[in-house]
Amino acid sequence: QPHPDEFVGLM
């Protein structure tokens, strides 16, 4: 389950 915080890193 990917955390939303990790997604921010991609952005």
UniProtKB/Swiss-Prot annotation:
Location of the protein in the cell: Secreted
Pfam families for the chain: Tachykinin (PF02202)
Modified residues (Methionine amide): 11
Tissue occurrence: Expressed by the skin glands.
Ranges that cross the membrane: none
Domain of life: Eukaryota
Residue numbers carrying Pyrrolidone carboxylic acid: 1
Family to which the UniProt record says this protein belongs: Belongs to the tachykinin family.
Function: Tachykinins are active peptides which excite neurons, evoke behavioral responses, are potent vasodilators and secretagogues, and contract (directly or indirectly) many smooth muscles.
Cellular component aspect of the GO annotation: extracellular region
Species in which this protein is naturally found: Pseudophryne guentheri
Any one GO biological process: defense response
Presence of the UniProt keyword Glycoprotein in the record: no
Protein name according to UniProt: Kassinin-like peptide K-I
Entry-linked InterPro entries: Tachy_Neuro_lke_CS (IPR013055), Tachykinin_dom (IPR008215)
Keywords associated with the record: Amidation, Amphibian defense peptide, Neuropeptide, Pyrrolidone carboxylic acid, Secreted
Main location: secreted
Magnesium as UniProt keyword: no
